[in-house]
């Protein structure tokens, strides 16, 4: 799917170097196609790196996707130039009256922070409530899953004693579900979180369908029956070296982090890791875009007919 982004966005050249099909806004205007409008609420500190990761997964299908980047934290960023944020991100007030085919809410490094202490918690809640009336389908990733479960279902924050970090085996529970179409019976996916998502809690306190679980990582992929909500508790968007970067960051800070599970060859951080989850990540996002967004969204976004209570 050619992703439609501003001509000057750094991700354009980065992804083209990987032979990813990126269509600039100027070229897209020459095609008489109604693109899917996807809003990405990027909560990660290294925003450019996260943009590259998610845009890569949104890029592999024949339809156009018009990407809009959203921020809700007005504080000065330590990891992303202000010029980049000003040029490529919108504020919520800019889009609150608009409708979108899809919304992606990324993770955030807030695993040990109480919800009440998250500076932009009111803004997160506002976006999630707004999406009920303005977005066809929303995909929550990692920490955003925990936030959404609290806001939508009243589930309190659950935290692991030790950080879950590594590449874990997962089991597909519903291979014929639309979101898992084409999934292997077992596959690998990376996790990096303190958040805990016990399968029994999801089943007891929500009406969500658990599609994939992991013996070590708990519930991995679950969704609402009307396809308007999807939750992935891991990081299928991660690059091969993302977990390594987190490990060495914490090691250099004197935090004595555990070596990520099933990641470095022979568990040796001096050896370069390889991505073993890339095909799964692409398939997950293609399925979400096709079955949860494209197949159910109205052609005219002014005629949204939300069914989410």
UniProtKB/Swiss-Prot annotation:
GO biological process terms on file: L-methionine biosynthetic process from homoserine via O-succinyl-L-homoserine and cystathionine
Reactions listed under catalytic activity: L-homoserine + succinyl-CoA = O-succinyl-L-homoserine + CoA
GO cellular component, one term: cytoplasm
Binding site for substrate: 163, 192, 249
Pathway as given in its UniProt record: Amino-acid biosynthesis; L-methionine biosynthesis via de novo pathway; O-succinyl-L-homoserine from L-homoserine: step 1/1
InterPro entries registered for this protein in UniProt: Class_I_gatase-like, HST_MetA, MetA_family
CDD domains: GATase1_HTS (cd03131)
Keyword NADP set for record: no
Keywords from the named record: Acyltransferase, Amino-acid biosynthesis, Cytoplasm, Methionine biosynthesis, Transferase
Site (Important for substrate specificity): 192
Family: Belongs to the MetA family.
Protein name according to UniProt: Homoserine O-succinyltransferase
């Amino acid at each position: 799917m050619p992703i439609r982004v501003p001509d000057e966005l750094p991700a354009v050249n980065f992804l083209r170097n990987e032979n990813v099909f990126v269509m600039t806004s100027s070229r897209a205007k020459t095609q008489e196609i109604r693109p899917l409008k996807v809003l990405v609420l990027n909560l990660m500190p290294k925003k450019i790196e996260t943009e590259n990761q998610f845009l890569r997964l949104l890029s592999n299908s024949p339809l156009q996707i018009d990407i809009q980047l959203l921020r809700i934290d007005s504080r000065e960023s330590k990891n992303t130039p202000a010029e980049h944020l000003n040029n490529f991100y919108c504020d919520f007030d800019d889009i609150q009256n608009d409708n979108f085919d899809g919304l992606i809410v990324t993770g955030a490094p807030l695993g040990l922070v109480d919800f009440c202490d998250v500076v932009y918690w009111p803004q997160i809640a506002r976006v999630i409530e707004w999406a009920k009336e303005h977005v066809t389908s929303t995909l929550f990733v990692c920490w955003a899953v925990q936030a959404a479960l609290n806001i939508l279902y009243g589930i309190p924050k659950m935290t692991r004693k030790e950080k879950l970090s590594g590449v874990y085996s997962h089991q597909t529970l519903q291979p014929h579900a639309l979101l898992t179409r084409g999934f292997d019976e077992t596959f690998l996916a990376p996790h990096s979180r303190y958040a805990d998502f016990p399968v029994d809690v999801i089943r007891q306190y929500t009406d969500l369908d658990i599609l994939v679980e992991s013996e070590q990582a708990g519930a991995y992929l679950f969704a609402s029956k009307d396809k308007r909500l999807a939750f992935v508790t891991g990081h299928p968007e991660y690059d091969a070296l993302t977990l390594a970067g987190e490990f060495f960051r914490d090691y250099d800070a004197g935090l004595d982090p555990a070596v990520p599970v099933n990641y470095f060859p022979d568990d040796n951080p001096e050896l370069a890791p390889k991505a073993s989850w890339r095909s799964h990540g692409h398939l997950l996002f293609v399925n979400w875009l096709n079955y949860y967004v494209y197949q159910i969204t109205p052609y005219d976004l002014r005629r949204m007919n939300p069914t989410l209570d």
